[in-house]
Amino acid sequence: MVVMKKKRILIVSAIVLLFLTVASAVTVFSADGDTTTQPKVEKAGGVELKVKRFPISRYQANNEASDDLIKGAFVGLTNVTFSFAGNIVRVVDTGMDILYNLQPIDEFANSITNVSKTVYKTLKKNFGEALFIFTCAYVVYLFCVRGSVKEAMRRSILFICVMVIGGLWMSNAGYYMKVLNALSVEAQGKLLTAGNGLVGIVQDEGNFADSSAIEKGKEMEGTVAVMRNLYFDIALMKPFLIVNFDETSEKKINEEDTDKGGLNRIDKLLSYKLSEDGEKDKKDYIKETEIDDYKNESMTSGNVFNQLGESFIAVVASIVIGIPFLALAFFNFLLQVVALVIVFFVPFAFILAYVPQLAYSGFVTLGRLGSVYLLKAMLGVIVLFVYVTCFIVDKLIPPNGFGMYLLNVAVLASILWIGFHKRDAIIKFVTAGKVVSVDNNMMENMRQNIVQPAWEQAKKIGGVWGNGGGVFTDFTKHFGGRKDGSNADGVTGAPSGGGNSPSGTAMGYDNTHAISRTPQKETANGIANHNSRSLKRNPQTLSKEQEKQKQKEAFANAKENKQQSHLARLRKDGINSPMLKDALNEGNEDLSKRAPILQDKKDESARTDQKEYVEQLLKQPNNQQQTDDASLQHEEESTSNRAPVLQENEKDTERTDQKAYIYDEQNQNLETDQQQDFEVQKDDSVSNSEPVAQEKTAEIKRSDQKVMMNQPEPQLGFESPQSTKVENQPIANNERKIRPSEPAKVHSDGIRVDEKQAVAPAENKTVSREKQPSSQTIKRTEQSVNSFDQVSLNEIARRSSSKVEDRLRRDERTR
């Protein structure tokens, strides 16, 4: 009986097992059939990887109108966007997996040992003996010649340490590299354990709920798996749920599932293959189950355009979140590569350490290698920062809905980007300044050493091309005025600018810097006899290099003299007189009222035609005078169209910047005032004693007096364009003429003294010529200019300087 019972039990058990096996096979076949697949379960460090459950290509937008002609095209465009985002997610996830977990040091440890031994033995065989003899001789020199026993002993011990430590490292380089790498990985794991303790408070669903499943000893791998799940959820999973279910919570979506025994709603939608039959079955499932049973409006035909707009979120999120995550993995891998490169140079460093002056080279190289491993361990701090930051943002701003999801992504991306730019500050803060950089400021060094020099060189090349264009422009300016009035020698006639255009402007010369030069003084000899003469001048041209050289010299002289001026010294001492400033400001205002400044900047010594004209004019008798007012008016109109007539002297050939005549006001005020008073008296006496009828001849013979010709310059705004009619009359008592032998006196700020102006429109001058009984005398109408009293700027400066000195003395006495 007992035997029969045992047989029955065995038969029943066999039948039950057979039935269960068949049922399991049927279930598996029905679940993983021709059109669907089952989700894969793959773990890393004890954490399941969500990105491995289904292929990334199945994360698409699903809609019942996918076969429609127009709306189907929009569904296809939405899926193209999801495909682009999926490729980015695939790259970042693979990079995090490989670059974090790949250990090139462990792979090349044995090879490193063999290479180090071979290189060290080769160098030692060829150079070791000579370097050993040199070191021994140096120790003997220190001991015997210099008598430094302490230094000789130190060098000997250091040499022995180099030989011993170098030999030990070369024989076991691979083992030491593995040990250091393992220590850095262990340090990273321990640092991340602290983060897992904070994240361990999560008990419900979420990406951080799996942190408690991290296996011991695999903290780094498990933490990286959690971060991979986090990135996948933000970049691809959440946009997929929003587009297809209009919800971001997987728990809420699966609660409505009526088929509790099979796959949930999300897995069911992802389980369909992308084959023709799979797409047909998925479309039937969408119409019958999602739309009819679950009332899912997100997959209806009217939501096609909304799905297209929401799909772009996946692309943005995958890029802005993926860059910081991938950068951390890249730096972790880069540090290991740097360590391998340093190890390759260790044998050379220890051979050079045989030289006494380079005894520390081997130890320094090993120190750099140790710092790389320390930096690799400190990289765990950055990973912990990202890990904890993602957790905090996920808890404070849970992505429960489309708006909250967008806010979560924006805040997390901003924090990660700020942390990425401040990575060196984080490491420096944690290590108390011992480690100051994660990547040794690689990006900034690349910008300064590669990008910036290339940009500067490109700017120089662009500047050369720009200068070439400027030279062509100047060439066209110089020769643009040559039209119909050229003679056999190629000389132009009257300039096309008319009487109102100065010579420099009419010839096309650059007059940018002409305002800082001394005014061109024209002679009175050119006023006589113009009815039968017409002056033709050749255009005086200089090369571009000579013009630039003259400008540079003028600016250099002006700068040097300005620094040496008395006013500059007062300003350096901190003395600023309000009265002096007011006086200088008044001088600046009066500057525009003074003598017109010649536009043409060419060298006056080359204008020989004017010399010849003046000499011929002096030799001719004074018997050609004008006879009527009409001829005089005609001559004045023709004169305005001619080039200015100049008289050469020493000062004209040595024209420099106005600032070259700056001198010390305090030491020469009294002498200057006396000289000016004497000149005024002399001018008055001469002008009162000369007859009116002989004034023209006297002015021609007096080579020390010059009168500015009425050359209107409307472009600079000094005078209005009108012809001046001058009559012979004694000069007023308050008028002062400038001798050609005297340089124009200028204040230290470049302001010409009012008393030394050749012609100023605002001066108090009234010139007239009275009619003579002779038949050849021509009567000219009197022209008066608005006059007002002027005070010498030199006098104002002298008074201001004296007041400043008195004030300083009072301040010193009060102290």
UniProtKB/Swiss-Prot annotation:
Signal sequence bounds: 1-25
Primary location recorded for the protein, binned into one broad class: membrane
Renumbered residue ranges of the record's region Disordered: 483-815
Compositional bias of kind Basic and acidic residues: 544-563, 599-614, 648-658, 696-705, 734-757, 796-815
Keywords for this protein: Cell membrane, Membrane, Signal, Transmembrane, Transmembrane helix
Annotated compartments: Cell membrane
Segments crossing the lipid bilayer: 127-147, 157-177, 311-331, 333-353, 372-392, 401-421
Record-level GO BP terms: transmembrane transport
Membrane topology note: Multi-pass membrane protein
GO cellular component, one term: plasma membrane
Positions with biased composition (Polar residues): 513-543, 619-630, 665-678, 720-732, 773-793
Keyword Transmembrane listed: yes
Name this protein carries in UniProt: Uncharacterized membrane protein YddG
Species of origin: Bacillus subtilis (strain 168)
